[in-house]
Amino acid sequence: MNEVYTDSSVALLLQRLQSTLGNCLVVADENWANVNWGLVRNTDQRSIHLISNRYDIAKSASTAGIDAYFNDFDFSALEPQSFDTVLFRVAKERATSHHVINNAAGLLRLNGRLILTGEKNDGLKTYVKQASKLFGDKASAEKSGAHYLASVQLHQQDAPALDDKNYAQTRPIITCDGLSLQSKPGIFGWDKIDRGSAYLIEHLPQFLERYTEAPTTLLDPVSYTL
């Protein structure tokens, strides 16, 4: 099912998906870039849906016949308590992982399962503990080489949510030449300005001077269904 460069934690989820039944939701970020979606199939006993913040991933999945959504992990179009399984390879950014785990609690039916994978350095064990507390479960991570997999079962839906830094909300980070530049959780390093970003901001006026008309549009990934 996996191509040569598929992330090993993603490969664990793909293996689990093969034996998973019911209504399944895959939450896919850049780690899923090299998956051959043509080999990830719906069956009479399994219906696969995908939500991704990467257009290429959502498009590939949609082309393979999978119900796919391209947006910034906006789950509002999905019916609450309608999934038996949610599969998520934890993200680089903590707020993103918390946001997905929180939403999984609302999307899963009671006794449904959130399947988490990642490496130790990704904080996988911490996320499993947090999800277990949120879900009212006592799950543990199983080791597979340098990667871990855990299955957290939903027993409650009224526990306090994890801190996702108000994930959906953009906020100003700096003003450049009278222009307020925005960022948000989910963008790695969103709450600080690194040297590369500072360089970009410093030279933004010169960049815009190249245009006879300044750019006025961008691709908005908030809600795009394939």
For each predicted feature, which ranges?
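Short, conserved SAM-binding/catalytic segment
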Residues: 57-70
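Class I SAM-dependent methyltransferase Rossmann-like catalytic core
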Residues: 1-20, 184-192
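A short SAM/SAH-binding and catalytic strip from SAM-dependent methyltransferases
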Residues: 84-98
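A short acidic, Gly/Pro-enriched loop at the edge of an enzyme's catalytic core
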Residues: 71-87
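A short glycine-rich, Lys/Arg-flanked "PGG" loop and its adjoining helix->strand segment in the class I
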Residues: 98-113
